[in-house]
């Protein structure tokens, strides 16, 4: 029995949360496995991909949420994602939780070079992938900043203090993990109550290709005149009983 399961019932994973994680394939890892992540693996699929234990995933997510909620100033928590698919998720997470965020390439010296223009000293660092965010993790280790990381089955855990085992390569999986993490932080702070579902849609945490969004917008704009033209040929009933008019 895990620490979360043996503790308060409030923090236990609900069936609806488990269904969300399964639907977004948060439990499907890679075909590779690092020795440090072996304890989080439940089994393998027929295709050879490793399956992550949902209970251990939830336990670490709750632990990470408690750490973030305990930081007095939310801006002292820095969320990073060098992986493109995670930029939208960390932006929405920071928007709701109030943390600082850094998307795209991490500039060397951000945590260690005090004369740098964008120098910051966060109290907690959250990263999307220990591999792509290795520079941020390395600098955090030099200045004693605790690190929370979304870790796939092949992730290295060097300098990672809290590893949340999950699929950190899928667009929907990354969005779901940050959505759940944001929700739990807000619940622990008392900003939202557990008895009422969070109104924020998880879809807003999913990365969208700018080109795809522009194409959809252009298609909608092109379809609008055609729809208006069709409406113009409708029939309107007159007040008198003699006829109909176009």
Swiss-Prot record:
<dbReference type="GO" id="GO:0000028">
    <property type="term" value="P:ribosomal small subunit assembly"/>
</dbReference>
<dbReference type="InterPro" id="IPR001865">
    <property type="entry name" value="Ribosomal_uS2"/>
</dbReference>
<dbReference type="InterPro" id="IPR023591">
    <property type="entry name" value="Ribosomal_uS2_flav_dom_sf"/>
</dbReference>
<keyword id="KW-0687">Ribonucleoprotein</keyword>
<comment type="similarity">
    <text>Belongs to the universal ribosomal protein uS2 family.</text>
</comment>
<dbReference type="GO" id="GO:0006412">
    <property type="term" value="P:translation"/>
</dbReference>
<dbReference type="GO" id="GO:0003735">
    <property type="term" value="F:structural constituent of ribosome"/>
</dbReference>
<keyword id="KW-0689">Ribosomal protein</keyword>
<keyword id="KW-0963">Cytoplasm</keyword>
<dbReference type="InterPro" id="IPR027498">
    <property type="entry name" value="Ribosomal_uS2_euk"/>
</dbReference>
<dbReference type="InterPro" id="IPR005707">
    <property type="entry name" value="Ribosomal_uS2_euk/arc"/>
</dbReference>
<dbReference type="GO" id="GO:0022627">
    <property type="term" value="C:cytosolic small ribosomal subunit"/>
</dbReference>
<protein>
    <recommendedName>
        <fullName>Small ribosomal subunit protein uS2</fullName>
    </recommendedName>
</protein>
<comment type="subunit">
    <text>Component of the small ribosomal subunit. Mature ribosomes consist of a small (40S) and a large (60S) subunit. The 40S subunit contains about 33 different proteins and 1 molecule of RNA (18S). The 60S subunit contains about 49 different proteins and 3 molecules of RNA (25S, 5.8S and 5S). Interacts with ribosomal protein S21.</text>
</comment>
<comment type="function">
    <text>Required for the assembly and/or stability of the 40S ribosomal subunit. Required for the processing of the 20S rRNA-precursor to mature 18S rRNA in a late step of the maturation of 40S ribosomal subunits.</text>
</comment>
<dbReference type="InterPro" id="IPR018130">
    <property type="entry name" value="Ribosomal_uS2_CS"/>
</dbReference>
<dbReference type="Pfam" id="PF00318">
    <property type="entry name" value="Ribosomal_S2"/>
</dbReference>
């Amino acid at each position: 029995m895990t620490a979360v399961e043996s503790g308060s019932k409030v923090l236990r994973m609900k069936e609806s949360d488990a269904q969300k994680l399964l639907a977004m394939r948060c439990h499907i890892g890679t075909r590779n496995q690092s020795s440090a992540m072996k304890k989080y693996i439940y089994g393998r699929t027929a295709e050879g991909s490793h399956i992550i234990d949902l209970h251990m995933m939830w336990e670490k997510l709750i632990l990470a949420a408690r750490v973030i909620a305990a930081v007095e100033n939310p801006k002292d928590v820095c969320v990073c994602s060098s992986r493109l698919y995670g930029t939208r998720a960390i932006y929405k997470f920071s928007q709701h939780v109030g943390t600082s965020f850094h998307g795209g390439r991490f500039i060397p010296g951000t945590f260690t070079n005090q004369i740098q223009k964008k120098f910051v000293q966060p109290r907690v660092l959250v990263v999307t992938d220990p591999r792509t965010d290795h520079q941020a993790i390395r600098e955090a280790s030099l200045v004693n900043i605790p690190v929370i990381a979304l870790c796939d089955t092949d992730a290295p855990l060097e300098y990672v203090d809290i590893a949340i085992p999950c699929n950190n390569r899928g667009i929907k999986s990354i969005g779901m993990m940050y959505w759940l993490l944001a929700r739990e932080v807000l619940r622990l702070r008392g900003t939202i109550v557990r008895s009422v579902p969070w109104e924020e849609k998880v879809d807003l945490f999913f990365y969208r290709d700018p080109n795809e969004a522009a194409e959809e917008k252009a298609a909608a704009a092109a379809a609008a005149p055609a729809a208006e033209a069709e409406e113009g040929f409708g029939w309107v009933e007159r007040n008198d009983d003699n006829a109909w008019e176009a």
